[in-house]
Amino acid sequence: EYAGINGIRQDTHPYADFDMMSEWCKAVTDEYPDFNIVGETWLNSNVLVSFWQKDSRLAAPRNSNLRTVMDFPLMEQMNKAFDEETTDWNGGLYRLYDYLTQDLVYADPMNLLVFLDNHDTSRFYLNEEATQNIDRYKQALVFLLTTRGIPQIYYGTEILMAADKANGDGRLRCDFPGGWKYDPRNCFYEANRTPQQNEAFTYMQKLLQWRKGNEVIAKGRLKHFAPNKGIYVYARKYGN
């Protein structure tokens, strides 16, 4: 009402009392219907995550009233899928197809937060050497920004920042280079980024500009087909 924010992320949502959080979510969204609450639901299967979404059949007759939950299982599948160049039905792009065929467990798959990484997980690239495979970045980014759900992009992804959780959470949350007087390099400026970082930055920028205002991609139903010879085809349709 005063801050003008569109929503908040509720940390470790399932840790709190179910009924209290249900009442709170309902009270907030009844008063501010355009305000969204994203619940951190860090669970390892879509069945478990789906329990916490508003109107879940699995939770009935109880109702969390939490509109948006975080799709951690899809994050895991994406990080594996784009590393596996295979046509097998148990790996590669088939992981994405197989996972999305199970969306019926969710009350509203369109209100899932989808992401490649975040401040609690290893970054999409574990180290600088891995960033040399920029095709992995491009394929994953296209999927993230065209599949169902609400995409979230962790800062630094646009310049291929890399970090392994095994080296501590501090590595995952390193400052973005630049923005402060004494930073040795300012990656807010094209001239200070490497050619590869500029390639990644421009690629994301173009994708986001294309997606902005695109109701088909943002709201359309997803139709997909089983991967064939390493090719995964899907489409989005909105209205007629």
Per-segment meaning from a language model:
Residues 108-132:
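Active-site clefts of carbohydrate-active enzymes
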Residues 6-107, 112, 133, 143, ...:
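Active-site-proximal helices and loops of the catalytic beta/alpha 8
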Residues 137-139:
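Conserved interdomain hinge at the start of the Helicase C-terminal
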Residues 123, 148-151, 211-215:
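Alpha-helix capping/termination and helix-coil
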Residues 217-239:
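Surface beta-strand/loop "capping" patches
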Residues 141-162:
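Substrate-binding cleft of secreted/luminal carbohydrate-active enzymes
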